[in-house]
């Protein structure tokens, strides 16, 4: 008792010694925001006020003083120039133009912005006496002021929208520390507007709730706090700012959110929930190192400190006492954030769990009782009193005794194979043991009948009995087996004993000849149950029939005993020989649909899984349950019938061709004409709303057996065939292909130029030739850096050849997938990364800024096409080409729809359509507009962010129709920002007129582009694909031919990479469909449609086709 009193007094003395160390720490002046935004125009007058920055005080006597950084910064923190244009009033925080920013200065800054458009610049504002370090700018002592840069003059006041007259582009948010003196933290007025538009009156007010600690002064329009804030009472204030604009007789009101967040300081002392400061810790069966024996909880109304501050702020000390206790136990600290309700709102708080943990294994003989004290100190606590608590753990370490039942009685079959498990022995409470090492042994009373073995299971400290010698089982005299079971604790050598009686049952039957050593080899039930294998208790393998539901844990397989194999765990007996249960124990390869086990074996499989242990392979394949439907005679009869039908078909075809050539009119074909023929059976059809077949316009238009086209020469674009050398095929479809080529003296250039040449195949129809001709006519008029460029054509004295720009890196989809292989390791380290990036800029690792730049370039090209009244119809990553310098080029406007991937397109009579990229109105109503291209652009954004991923993963295209109609949209991918995903969802609005136009999309991407510069984790969550466009030919093996397919000697380099076909859309699309179509909802639409609208109606799945597809899938 005296010792306890003395210990308590010592603890109180220690607490008193800690109190003087707990004092208040002044944090100094701080900004109410970490970023400010304003617009900046070229040729704004010197002296124009721009905005105020505000500082809040830590103490009433502090006086703020503001300083500007020396430089202006641009995209990716590029240092552009010394700040010669903007100044600040040191006492008020007013930023103003010191001199006008003219066009020459703007161009100088643009040149230094690494080739990116000069959209935003920023500078740094510092608070004195904070040290003015140009390279560092961290809140609260530094803030950034961003200026949206416009290379135009300030717009006319009458043209400004009310939102532009009232608030900046970016919504402000504020940070205010608790327990600080009240002060001004914002000024509503937009100073440039007030300075340049004095005739417009703007008034502001806050929609304040009753009793809120904020006010807006009506004369100065400054927002300030009324009194010191308390975060523990309320952490967030979601206010609303109201602006009223008076311009003549016009009055308009604009409202925006005005959020204020109260920042925490350590002003709440830790406490015990419900006053509990003592916990009991009983150590008995769980005696392993790292075992948690007791936990006490401490509550703190302050928020969880940052990980770097955690050790410094919260210290936990196991107070000196018994040396054995100091060596045996330790205290672990686990903080977790929680929420508590205060004044009708939720605020964050912290619960700290202090766990008493074993620092080492304890022997079963250890027997002690003690009390441990832990001192918890919130060292940053700034309130009255002390942030110190004392935790108490009452510890009892109990001894463990070993006991076995007096007798075990088991049975075993004479047919049992080696390693067959027949039962378990276990000391009392062994399944609860942890950290106790018990070993089991068997002592046989008869040497000639020693059949069994025992091994200790590490999982539950039991002993598993198994057949170790099958020869003894066959001896008639071994009808009963007698053993002594001995369990020994390895640390203390304490023992327990029991009698084991095993009855041998049945008679021995010899093994079938030709049976495998392992049951797992068998793939069918019949052969499985006819044989035995290692580990079989009955001498015969057992078949486990699966449930047949895809990849499942209950897969079909052959096992020695379904009680133990497979069970997802390779036990200590199964580890003796891989042939016992490879389904649980195999470390080799597994082929087919499966989920691997941890750390080995098969966790789940598809169909039937069988294994070949010697080859270290398992196979999971669909179950083969069907017998042959046709025997040898049946197959002979069918083959004869097929051969006879084929002969008859050949004879009839020859007769028809002879008649056709005999009676058909054959007009002469000159070298300037191209003639194509389409069989009558290939005419497309569409379906009415009732499901009846009807001929399409395209089919009626092509009922003429032969169409002839005269291609007129255009001297401006005609290129001599003799100067064009064709090379390797880059891509081909059913009717067209693209080859790499070299052109001599192209457009007046000296020497050879690498180009791509697009042409038709011999089986092309008049429709494909019309598409190629209209593409030719459109490309003559199109000229944009982000649209594939036309160089010329060969239209005379041979087939039509289009010569277009060559893209070095192929399709964007392939480029993105290749970038996955770069990974973080490609970035190198230190200076080597920067050197590599400078020497090979196109090979450096992708950043999020690069991906946004790709999307911005494509949006620029699509904006241009929209202004040209062109609709793409197939905007996707596979149809974007990547040229030198990572320049995006829009291509493939429709001709190459026959060559796409199976999972991207749905096959119809007219080819394949890109279901997963099509807008909802295109799928259901066959409407194709610029706004349907916006939908496709949203899917393209998803492809870019996922580095070439397949949209709607796991969803077949045929099932996508109803999912889209019911509002299904793809989820936000990893590495995708909220603002990028928000842009995707806007592109996928169901109503086309609610989607953004490409001009607005470009602006949104410009804003994102200047914010992001972080590297992507290309190794995370991305599959490793093989090279997509590799056909095995080297550069030297690429054949060269001229336009007449005559071989040429190789005199030029032939480096190439495969691409999809290039193409453009029809420039003469009518505004309305030539065939009136009725929407399902009965409304008429004003969107322009694709000219062959009735043809594309045939792309939709009919109800019967959809039902057939579902049946096939199932």
Curated annotation (Swiss-Prot):
For the modification Phosphoserine, the affected residues are 696
Needed cofactors: Ca(2+)
- Spell out the note in the miscellaneous section: Treatment with withaferin A (WA) leads tumor regression in medullary thyroid carcinomas (MTC).
The effect of residue 891 to A is: In MTC; familial form
Which parts of the sequence bind Ca(2+) 4?
267, 564-565, 567, 569, 574, 584
Provide the record's note on post-translational modification: Autophosphorylated on C-terminal tyrosine residues upon ligand stimulation. Proteolytically cleaved by caspase-3. The soluble RET kinase fragment is able to induce cell death. The extracellular cell-membrane anchored RET cadherin fragment accelerates cell adhesion in sympathetic neurons.
Protein name from the UniProt record: Proto-oncogene tyrosine-protein kinase receptor Ret
Which taxonomic lineage does the organism of this UniProt entry have? Answer: Eukaryota, Metazoa, Chordata, Craniata, Vertebrata
State how changing residue 630 to S affects the protein, per the record: In MTC; sporadic form
The listed outcome for residue 64 to L is: In HSCR1; familial form
Q: Does the keyword Disulfide bond apply?
A: yes
Cadherin-like region 4 (CLD4): annotated segments: 405-506
User: Which UniProt keywords are given for this protein, alphabetically ordered?
Assistant: ATP-binding, Cell adhesion, Cell membrane, Chromosomal rearrangement, Disease variant, Disulfide bond, Endosome, Glycoprotein, Hirschsprung disease, Kinase, Membrane, Nucleotide-binding, Phosphoprotein, Proto-oncogene, Receptor, Signal, Transferase, Transmembrane, Transmembrane helix, Tyrosine-protein kinase
The protein's induction, as recorded, is: Positively regulated by NKX2-1, PHOX2B, SOX10 and PAX3.
Q: What is the effect of changing residue 778 to I?
A: In a patient with renal agenesis; uncertain significance; constitutively phosphorylated
Active-site residues from the entry: 874 (proton acceptor)
Query: Which gene underlies this protein?
Result: RET
Q: What is the effect of changing residue 32 to L?
A: In HSCR1; familial form
Name the consequence of residue 881 to V.
Answer: In MTC; confers resistance to nintedanib inhibitor
Q: Which reaction does it catalyse?
A: L-tyrosyl-[protein] + ATP = O-phospho-L-tyrosyl-[protein] + ADP + H(+)
Effect noted on mutating residue 198 to T: In a patient with renal agenesis; uncertain significance; prevents phosphorylation in response to GDNF
Residues engaged in binding Ca(2+) 1: 178-179, 230, 232
The record places the site described as Cleavage at 707-708, 1017-1018
